[in-house]
């Protein structure tokens, strides 16, 4: 009986590793802060893929990078990952002018992505975690999980954005369709979002401060950064 049980365990483990591997991305690719999500493949309805979103650590002298990319794999084969390309860069104003004379894009940190339904259609929102002054609360929208994502909360000046998000934002759609946002550095914040903007507080609600104790506060937790509802 013990031998039979051991054989079952071995076969189970072998079956798992037959469909997965580590490292799962090429050694030249660097995506820390990864958030994996399972979304329906827009090109193969009824099939699902795992999409990896994260900061793109390709700057030699700074954290993260000036673009965000996504890799994906079929849920049935986690050994074959596909590069789906650059999904977002922040380098131009709303009317297409470069932010800076040297046309360098903004550095983007750990992002988050959410899927929701709008008018019967799947929509994806990206919090790219842009920390450049005036664009910290940036949010972008796409009708595909692999982008491209377009900024959807420009101010009237066309170069800054509006909203409540701060450092390391996360966004979450509950089963009842209500949307929530989370962010913070040393202290944690959260709020129910207005579904018409996806970046402002829902009317009649307030920002919740210190959702859990921060790293400089007394309490069971020591929140520092990287809000996530995962």
Predicted feature locations:
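Basic side chains
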Residues: 2-3, 230
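Sec-dependent N-terminal signal peptides
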Residues: 3-16
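Carbohydrate-active catalytic/glycan-binding domains of CAZyme proteins
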Residues: 20-230
């Amino acid at each position: 009986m013990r031998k039979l049980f051991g054989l079952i365990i071995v076969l189970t483990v072998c079956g798992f590793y037959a469909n997965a591997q580590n490292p799962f991305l090429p050694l030249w690719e660097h995506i820390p802060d990864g958030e994996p999500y399972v979304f329906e493949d827009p090109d193969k309805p009824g099939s699902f893929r795992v999409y990896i979103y994260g900061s793109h650590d390709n700057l030699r002298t700074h954290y993260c990078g000036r673009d965000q990319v996504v890799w994906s794999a079929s849920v049935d084969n986690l050994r074959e990952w596909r590069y789906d390309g650059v999904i977002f860069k922040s380098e131009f104003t709303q009317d297409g002018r470069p932010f800076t004379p040297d046309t360098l894009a903004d550095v983007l940190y750990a992002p988050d992505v959410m899927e929701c339904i709008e008018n019967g259609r799947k929509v994806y929102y990206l919090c790219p975690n842009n920390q450049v002054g005036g664009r910290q609360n940036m949010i972008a929208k796409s009708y595909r999980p692999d982008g491209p994502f377009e900024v959807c909360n420009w101010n009237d000046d066309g170069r800054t954005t509006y909203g409540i998000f701060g450092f390391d934002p996360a966004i979450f759609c509950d089963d009842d369709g209500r949307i929530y946002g989370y962010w913070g550095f040393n202290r944690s914040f959260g709020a129910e979002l207005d579904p018409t903007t996806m970046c402002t507080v829902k009317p009649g609600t307030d920002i919740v401060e210190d959702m859990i104790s921060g790293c400089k506060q007394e309490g069971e937790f020591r929140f520092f950064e990287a809000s996530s509802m995962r």
